Protein backbone atom coordinates (compact mmCIF):
# COMPACT_ATOMS: atom_id res chain seq x y z
CA UNK A 1 0.00 0.00 0.00
CA UNK A 2 1.01 3.63 -0.32
CA UNK A 3 2.96 4.77 2.72
CA UNK A 4 1.38 7.52 4.82
CA UNK A 5 4.44 9.69 4.32
CA UNK A 6 4.45 9.41 0.52
CA UNK A 7 2.44 12.61 0.08
CA UNK A 8 5.33 14.45 1.75
CA UNK A 9 8.37 12.52 0.51
CA UNK A 10 7.31 11.87 -3.08
CA UNK A 11 8.90 8.44 -3.27
CA UNK A 12 8.56 5.03 -1.69
CA UNK A 13 11.08 2.21 -2.05
CA UNK A 14 10.24 -1.42 -1.30
CA UNK A 15 12.92 -4.07 -1.24
CA UNK A 16 12.41 -7.33 -3.11
CA UNK A 17 13.76 -10.88 -2.85
CA UNK A 18 17.17 -9.98 -4.28
CA UNK A 19 19.42 -7.01 -4.93
CA UNK A 20 18.36 -5.52 -8.28
CA UNK A 21 20.67 -5.51 -11.27
CA UNK A 22 18.20 -4.15 -13.83
CA UNK A 23 15.06 -2.03 -13.80
CA UNK A 24 11.97 -1.23 -15.82
CA UNK A 25 9.96 1.97 -15.56
CA UNK A 26 6.16 1.94 -15.75
CA UNK A 27 3.63 4.75 -15.80
CA UNK A 28 1.07 6.40 -18.01
CA UNK A 29 2.18 8.49 -20.97
CA UNK A 30 3.37 11.99 -20.03
CA UNK A 31 4.17 10.92 -16.45
CA UNK A 32 7.96 11.27 -16.48
CA UNK A 33 8.82 7.70 -17.43
CA UNK A 34 11.51 8.71 -19.92
CA UNK A 35 13.05 11.19 -17.47
CA UNK A 36 13.21 8.67 -14.62
CA UNK A 37 14.52 5.91 -16.88
CA UNK A 38 17.32 8.11 -18.18
CA UNK A 39 18.14 9.46 -14.71
CA UNK A 40 18.55 5.99 -13.20
CA UNK A 41 20.29 4.59 -16.25
CA UNK A 42 22.87 7.37 -16.29
CA UNK A 43 23.60 7.49 -12.59
CA UNK A 44 23.46 3.91 -11.28
CA UNK A 45 24.83 0.54 -12.30
CA UNK A 46 21.32 -0.76 -13.02
CA UNK A 47 20.56 -1.82 -16.59
CA UNK A 48 17.28 -0.63 -18.13
CA UNK A 49 14.97 -3.21 -19.69
CA UNK A 50 11.63 -3.25 -21.50
CA UNK A 51 11.17 -7.02 -21.24
CA UNK A 52 8.25 -6.87 -18.79
CA UNK A 53 5.91 -5.36 -21.37
CA UNK A 54 4.70 -1.98 -22.59
CA UNK A 55 5.56 0.57 -19.93
CA UNK A 56 2.32 2.53 -20.39
CA UNK A 57 -0.01 -0.46 -20.17
CA UNK A 58 -1.50 -2.54 -17.39
CA UNK A 59 0.80 -5.15 -15.79
CA UNK A 60 0.75 -8.18 -18.08
CA UNK A 61 4.12 -9.89 -17.59
CA UNK A 62 4.33 -13.64 -16.98
CA UNK A 63 6.72 -13.23 -14.05
CA UNK A 64 8.92 -10.58 -12.45
CA UNK A 65 12.49 -11.85 -12.01
CA UNK A 66 13.81 -11.23 -8.48
CA UNK A 67 16.72 -9.14 -9.74
CA UNK A 68 14.47 -6.67 -11.63
CA UNK A 69 13.43 -3.42 -9.95
CA UNK A 70 10.04 -2.05 -11.01
CA UNK A 71 9.87 1.76 -11.01
CA UNK A 72 6.41 3.36 -11.08
CA UNK A 73 5.88 7.03 -12.00
CA UNK A 74 2.87 9.23 -11.24
CA UNK A 75 2.05 12.86 -12.07
CA UNK A 76 -0.53 15.47 -11.08
CA UNK A 77 -3.70 14.78 -13.08
CA UNK A 78 -4.10 18.39 -14.22
CA UNK A 79 -0.64 18.74 -15.77
CA UNK A 80 -0.90 15.18 -17.07
CA UNK A 81 -4.21 15.85 -18.84
CA UNK A 82 -2.82 18.99 -20.47
CA UNK A 83 0.20 17.05 -21.71
CA UNK A 84 -2.00 14.23 -23.01
CA UNK A 85 -3.95 16.78 -25.05
CA UNK A 86 -0.80 18.50 -26.28
CA UNK A 87 0.70 15.17 -27.38
CA UNK A 88 -2.16 12.71 -27.90
CA UNK A 89 0.01 9.68 -28.55
CA UNK A 90 -1.74 6.85 -30.42
CA UNK A 91 -5.04 8.76 -30.65
CA UNK A 92 -6.86 8.53 -33.99
CA UNK A 93 -7.57 11.72 -35.97
CA UNK A 94 -11.06 12.17 -34.50
CA UNK A 95 -9.49 12.49 -31.05
CA UNK A 96 -6.65 14.74 -32.14
CA UNK A 97 -9.00 17.46 -33.42
CA UNK A 98 -10.95 17.79 -30.16
CA UNK A 99 -10.55 20.93 -28.04
CA UNK A 100 -9.40 20.27 -24.49
CA UNK A 101 -12.81 20.21 -22.73
CA UNK A 102 -14.16 17.69 -25.24
CA UNK A 103 -10.92 15.69 -25.30
CA UNK A 104 -10.99 14.92 -21.58
CA UNK A 105 -14.70 13.97 -21.74
CA UNK A 106 -14.63 11.88 -24.92
CA UNK A 107 -14.81 8.10 -24.87
CA UNK A 108 -11.13 7.17 -24.86
CA UNK A 109 -9.85 5.94 -28.22
CA UNK A 110 -6.33 4.91 -29.20
CA UNK A 111 -4.91 2.70 -31.92
CA UNK A 112 -1.74 0.72 -32.59
CA UNK A 113 -0.56 3.38 -34.98
CA UNK A 114 3.15 2.71 -35.47
CA UNK A 115 4.97 -0.60 -35.64
CA UNK A 116 8.09 0.62 -33.86
CA UNK A 117 6.22 1.19 -30.60
CA UNK A 118 4.65 -2.27 -30.45
CA UNK A 119 6.74 -5.42 -31.04
CA UNK A 120 3.68 -7.61 -31.58
CA UNK A 121 2.41 -5.33 -34.35
CA UNK A 122 5.88 -5.36 -35.86
CA UNK A 123 5.83 -9.17 -35.85
CA UNK A 124 2.30 -10.15 -36.88
CA UNK A 125 0.47 -6.97 -37.88
CA UNK A 126 -2.42 -4.99 -36.47
CA UNK A 127 -1.57 -1.42 -37.43
CA UNK A 128 -4.63 0.79 -37.03
CA UNK A 129 -6.46 -1.61 -34.72
CA UNK A 130 -7.67 -0.57 -31.24
CA UNK A 131 -4.86 -0.35 -28.71
CA UNK A 132 -5.78 -3.13 -26.30
CA UNK A 133 -3.42 -1.78 -23.63
CA UNK A 134 -5.85 1.15 -23.26
CA UNK A 135 -8.93 -1.06 -22.83
CA UNK A 136 -10.13 -2.38 -19.48
CA UNK A 137 -7.81 -5.36 -18.85
CA UNK A 138 -10.62 -7.64 -17.61
CA UNK A 139 -13.74 -6.63 -19.53
CA UNK A 140 -12.12 -5.26 -22.68
CA UNK A 141 -14.43 -2.28 -22.52
CA UNK A 142 -13.51 1.20 -23.70
CA UNK A 143 -12.96 3.75 -20.94
CA UNK A 144 -15.64 6.47 -20.91
CA UNK A 145 -13.11 9.31 -20.63
CA UNK A 146 -9.48 10.21 -20.02
CA UNK A 147 -9.76 10.27 -16.23
CA UNK A 148 -11.44 6.87 -16.12
CA UNK A 149 -8.39 5.61 -18.00
CA UNK A 150 -6.13 7.27 -15.43
CA UNK A 151 -8.05 5.78 -12.53
CA UNK A 152 -7.73 2.25 -13.90
CA UNK A 153 -4.10 2.63 -14.99
CA UNK A 154 -3.23 3.99 -11.55
CA UNK A 155 -4.82 0.94 -9.91
CA UNK A 156 -2.74 -1.28 -12.16
CA UNK A 157 0.42 0.67 -11.40
CA UNK A 158 -0.11 0.54 -7.63
CA UNK A 159 -0.73 -3.22 -7.85
CA UNK A 160 3.05 -3.66 -8.17
CA UNK A 161 3.16 -2.97 -4.43
CA UNK A 162 1.29 -6.28 -3.97
CA UNK A 163 3.31 -8.41 -6.40
CA UNK A 164 6.24 -9.42 -4.19
CA UNK A 165 8.86 -7.59 -6.23
CA UNK A 166 11.25 -4.71 -5.62
CA UNK A 167 9.30 -1.52 -6.32
CA UNK A 168 9.95 2.20 -6.44
CA UNK A 169 6.89 4.44 -6.46
CA UNK A 170 7.80 8.03 -7.31
CA UNK A 171 6.10 11.31 -8.06
CA UNK A 172 7.46 12.90 -11.22
CA UNK A 173 7.39 16.42 -9.83
CA UNK A 174 9.44 15.46 -6.75
CA UNK A 175 12.08 13.55 -8.70
CA UNK A 176 12.48 16.44 -11.13
CA UNK A 177 12.85 18.86 -8.21
CA UNK A 178 15.44 16.74 -6.36
CA UNK A 179 16.95 14.16 -8.73
CA UNK A 180 20.11 13.70 -6.68
CA UNK A 181 18.13 13.18 -3.49
CA UNK A 182 16.09 10.55 -5.30
CA UNK A 183 19.20 8.78 -6.55
CA UNK A 184 20.78 8.83 -3.10
CA UNK A 185 17.66 7.28 -1.59
CA UNK A 186 17.61 4.66 -4.35
CA UNK A 187 21.22 3.62 -3.79
CA UNK A 188 20.68 3.35 -0.05
CA UNK A 189 17.37 1.48 -0.25
CA UNK A 190 18.74 -1.28 -2.49
CA UNK A 191 22.36 -1.44 -1.26
CA UNK A 192 23.66 -0.32 -4.64
CA UNK A 193 27.27 0.82 -5.07
CA UNK A 194 27.95 4.53 -5.40
CA UNK A 195 28.86 5.34 -9.02
CA UNK A 196 32.48 6.25 -9.67
CA UNK A 197 31.52 8.88 -12.26
CA UNK A 198 30.05 12.26 -11.22
CA UNK A 199 26.32 12.92 -11.37
CA UNK A 200 24.98 13.29 -14.91
CA UNK A 201 21.84 15.47 -15.00
CA UNK A 202 19.06 15.20 -17.55
CA UNK A 203 19.10 18.52 -19.39
CA UNK A 204 17.20 17.98 -22.62
CA UNK A 205 13.69 17.05 -23.61
CA UNK A 206 13.18 13.29 -23.76
CA UNK A 207 10.93 11.10 -25.84
CA UNK A 208 10.06 11.13 -29.51
CA UNK A 209 8.57 14.19 -31.16
CA UNK A 210 4.81 13.86 -31.51
CA UNK A 211 3.68 13.79 -35.14
CA UNK A 212 -0.02 14.66 -35.51
CA UNK A 213 -2.12 12.85 -38.10
CA UNK A 214 -4.28 15.94 -38.77
CA UNK A 215 -3.34 19.23 -40.41
CA UNK A 216 -4.57 21.49 -37.61
CA UNK A 217 -4.89 20.82 -33.91
CA UNK A 218 -6.62 22.92 -31.24
CA UNK A 219 -4.37 24.77 -28.82
CA UNK A 220 -3.83 23.24 -25.39
CA UNK A 221 -4.63 25.60 -22.48
CA UNK A 222 -1.69 27.01 -20.53
CA UNK A 223 -3.23 25.76 -17.27
CA UNK A 224 -6.03 23.41 -16.32
CA UNK A 225 -9.35 25.26 -16.80
CA UNK A 226 -11.21 26.01 -13.57
CA UNK A 227 -14.50 25.08 -15.22
CA UNK A 228 -13.25 21.52 -15.80
CA UNK A 229 -12.12 20.84 -12.23
CA UNK A 230 -15.48 19.50 -11.06
CA UNK A 231 -15.44 16.96 -13.89
CA UNK A 232 -11.89 15.92 -12.94
CA UNK A 233 -12.80 15.52 -9.28
CA UNK A 234 -15.89 13.49 -10.12
CA UNK A 235 -13.98 11.07 -12.33
CA UNK A 236 -10.90 10.39 -10.18
CA UNK A 237 -10.33 8.33 -7.05
CA UNK A 238 -9.62 11.36 -4.87
CA UNK A 239 -8.56 9.33 -1.84
CA UNK A 240 -5.81 7.60 -3.80
CA UNK A 241 -4.80 10.83 -5.51
CA UNK A 242 -4.46 12.57 -2.15
CA UNK A 243 -2.32 9.75 -0.75
CA UNK A 244 -0.03 10.35 -3.72
CA UNK A 245 0.19 14.04 -2.80
CA UNK A 246 -2.27 15.40 -5.34
CA UNK A 247 -5.10 17.69 -4.21
CA UNK A 248 -7.52 19.20 -6.70
CA UNK A 249 -9.17 22.02 -4.76
Residue ranges of predicted features:
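PAPS-dependent sulfotransferase catalytic domain
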Residues: 1-170
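PAPS-dependent sulfotransferases, especially Golgi type II membrane carbohydrate sulfotransferases
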Residues: 1-23, 27, 138-144, 158-161, ...
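PAPS/PAP-binding and catalytic site of the sulfotransferase fold
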Residues: 34-43, 167-194
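Short, solvent-exposed coil/turn linker segments
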Residues: 99, 171-174, 198, 220
Amino acid sequence: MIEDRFAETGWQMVRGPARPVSFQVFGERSSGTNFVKRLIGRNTGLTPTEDLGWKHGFPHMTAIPPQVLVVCCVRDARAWALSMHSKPWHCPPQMQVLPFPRFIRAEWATIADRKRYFPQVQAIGGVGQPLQHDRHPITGQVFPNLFALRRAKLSGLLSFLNRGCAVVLCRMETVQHDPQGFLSALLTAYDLPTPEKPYRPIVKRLGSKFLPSVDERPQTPDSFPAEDLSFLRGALDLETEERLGFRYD
